[in-house]
């Protein structure tokens, strides 16, 4: 039984806790593993036990995983009350662009700097970036950093008020498309078919921007875990988090297959 199944916080004792400075902005990052670097960004409402479970799976597959603290309480079990407060704070934060018309979230510049540092420390052909929910699209924006060569966009939820939006300014969108085309990058993405926070309209917008470079995979909502933590049950209220809160850890399950596909994608690009 993991921490989420037990309703417990995760103490994160198997990661080193670092204070990482990017252009004078300092944030906490949890780091563990050996091998090429992968930046794994948390979903709302923070670095939950399920996010850490995914981080450990990536680490144990032969990567150095970097988990930046961007919002919420690190390691906290996601309750409905606390999660709603984290969402409210993030939506008015200057670091994020939660609503349509806001363009690219400024925090992605810091995350690109983290990717540069990870590549410098770990070497290899480049770095992977996994975004989840609120940070889902950040993995795509991070391809503006040359070291990021393996972006995974999981159930991106921003902008919250535009189901066909991409949380990208026009200039950044053009630059991302050019980078993807120039370097032959494939963008791997996942969502549930009945997710109201990441709809088919959003995936269609990615396809319009990126063409065949966008590999969007859709799982049936009926495959989602039926007893997720309270924040996902009471606030999210829909199948959403394919490889974290709504993952079913059973051999052969579609969500576990998605996890394995992500790890295989990272390995093919970062272990060469």
Predicted regions and their residues:
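N-terminal cap/leader regions of alpha/beta-hydrolase-fold enzymes
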Residues: 1-272
């Amino acid at each position: 039984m993991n921490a989420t199944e037990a309703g417990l916080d995760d103490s994160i004792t198997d990661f080193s806790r670092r204070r990482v400075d990017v252009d004078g902005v300092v944030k906490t990052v949890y780091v563990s593993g050996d091998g090429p670097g992968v930046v794994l960004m948390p979903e709302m409402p923070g670095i939950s036990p399920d996010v850490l479970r995914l981080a450990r799976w990536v680490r144990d597959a032969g990567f150095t995983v970097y988990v930046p603290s961007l919002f919420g309480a690190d390691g906290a079990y996601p309750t409905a009350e606390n999660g709603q407060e984290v969402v409210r704070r993030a939506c008015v934060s200057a670091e994020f662009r939660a609503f349509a018309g806001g363009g690219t979230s400024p925090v992605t510049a810091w995350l690109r700097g983290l990717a540069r540092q990870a590549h410098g420390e770990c070497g290899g052909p480049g770095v992977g970036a996994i975004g989840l929910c609120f940070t889902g699209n950040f993995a795509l924006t991070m391809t503006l950093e040359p070291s990021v060569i393996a972006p995974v966009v999981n159930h991106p939820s921003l902008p919250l008020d535009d189901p066909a939006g991409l949380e990208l300014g026009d200039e950044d969108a053009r630059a991302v498309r050019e980078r993807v085309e120039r370097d032959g990058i494939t963008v791997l993405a996942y969502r549930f078919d009945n997710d109201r926070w990441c709809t088919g309209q959003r995936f269609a917008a990615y396809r319009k921007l990126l063409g065949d470079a966008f590999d969007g995979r859709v799982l049936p909502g009926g495959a989602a875990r039926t007893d997720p933590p309270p924040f996902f049950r009471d606030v999210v209220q829909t199948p959403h988090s394919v490889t974290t809160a709504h993952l079913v850890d059973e051999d052969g399950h579609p969500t576990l297959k998605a996890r394995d596909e992500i790890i295989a994608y990272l390995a093919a690009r970062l272990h060469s």
